[in-house]
């Protein structure tokens, strides 16, 4: 018979009666690269039909359920240096993650970290295989380690995670924390991409042709002042 892996049982329990979310969660990570490539097809199509304004509410609804928060290096480092569980789930989070859904900040056993190949970097030019997509917390990292060998998933230390982020920043990449209703509505995935090879940045660029206020990414909350 079929033997369900422990990490699969974990996400099944997490979603309870919402089998639809369990299936979405499972497919999203187990078929990470095909999922991202399919998203890219949709983005390229939307880029050509920005005249179709009735799509704006649908795009906004999607972004309210799947979005990212840009992180400055110092904030990313704080996450990777956590030595105890962190739970911040109140509506006050919306001040820094300004979306209706998926704004919980939850890290259970944050020292348990995995990394795998970034699906965006493999789907977009120059089609690089870069091991820089990071999962923080036992639940999500265990799932990656049990299901994502084909994407070179491996366990890493907190120090190694900081090193990956720092190396990516030095080459002009932007770090984001991702939130998705279908994966529990909380952060856990942190990745670094350039705007030209990141699905979320490309989605924002395409959908801002519909409405300039549409964005899948929330800003870091910091601004730069230049003394003259």
Regions found by a protein language model. Give the residues of each.
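N-terminal, charged low-complexity regulatory/assembly segments
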Residues: 3-132, 162-171
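Glycine-rich, charged/polar anion/phosphate-binding loops
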Residues: 99-101, 174-180, 205
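Disulfide-bonded cysteines in secreted/extracellular proteins and peptides
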Residues: 118-120, 132-133, 191-193, 198
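Compact structured core domains
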Residues: 146-182, 188-197
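Activation/maturation switch segments at domain boundaries
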Residues: 172-174, 196-219
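Ferredoxin-like iron-sulfur electron-transfer modules
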Residues: 178-185, 209-228
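Cysteine-centered iron-sulfur cluster-binding motifs in ferredoxin-type domains/subunits
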Residues: 190-201, 223-228
């Amino acid at each position: 018979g079929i033997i369900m892996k422990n990490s699969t049982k974990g996400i099944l329990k997490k979603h309870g009666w919402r089998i639809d979310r369990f299936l979405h969660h499972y497919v999203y990570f187990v078929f990470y690269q095909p999922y991202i490539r399919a998203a890219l097809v949709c983005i390229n199509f939307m880029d050509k039909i920005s005249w179709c304004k009735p799509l704006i509410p649908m795009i906004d609804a999607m972004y309210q359920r799947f979005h990212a928060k840009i992180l400055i290096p110092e904030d990313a480092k704080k996450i990777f240096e956590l030595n105890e569980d962190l739970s911040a789930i109140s509506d006050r989070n919306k001040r820094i993650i300004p979306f209706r859904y998926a704004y919980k900040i939850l890290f259970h056993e944050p020292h348990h970290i995995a990394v795998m190949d970034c699906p965006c970097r493999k789907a977009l030019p120059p089609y690089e295989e870069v091991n820089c997509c990071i999962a923080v917390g036992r639940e999500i990292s265990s799932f990656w380690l049990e299901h994502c060998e084909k994407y070179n998933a491996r366990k890493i230390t907190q120090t190694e995670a900081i090193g990956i982020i720092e190396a990516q920043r030095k080459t002009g990449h932007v770090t984001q924390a991702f939130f998705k209703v279908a994966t529990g509505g909380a952060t856990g995935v942190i990745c670094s991409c350039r705007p030209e090879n990141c699905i979320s940045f490309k989605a924002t660029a395409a959908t801002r042709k519909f409405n300039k206020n549409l964005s899948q990414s929330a800003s870091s909350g910091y601004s730069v002042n230049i003394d003259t």
